[in-house]
């Protein structure tokens, strides 16, 4: 009940800068300093590493050490530049997942952060289906998504994702800026066939469309934490 009330309150704030203190799910990226709001987190998406394509395909760690998080559910995030993974990358990912869990973290899933082109979602779904088969049975699989998917995504590709991933977090920002006209994309969220969350930028603009809270696939928000601007 408390989570539902918080969700409704957050959705009701029009045109306000995103106040992280009103939310309970956060991304914490490399180079971003921890903030007091993390103490209220129920779900954390922590960047573990990045799969680079050059000079060779490899998983490069982005954290100095294995995290130790008490209480909050953890999603291990991997930023991906290529889907052509070598067997070594899969082994590295699974080994890191095991280390995070062995350290006492409640790791619920792996999130893949990849800028899949809107017209090639079917290919992305095939990669994700293969990855899912390699993950432990109790490990969920999530992805980040582009707002364009809701408006122009191939219906067959969206349906393929629905059979593979547990959630998509649709980001209304690129880099450190909110996408202009994001409301137009959100108006078409009825096309989404996968449970989804909305990714917000700390301090960025946000106005929830009236229909969002009633969407049966809407699961809440994730706030991308950012370092305060230097003065």
Q: Which residues fall in each region the model found?
A:
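Sec-dependent N-terminal signal peptides
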Residues: 2-11
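Secreted glycan hydrolases and related glycan-binding modules that recognize and/or cleave
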Residues: 11-231
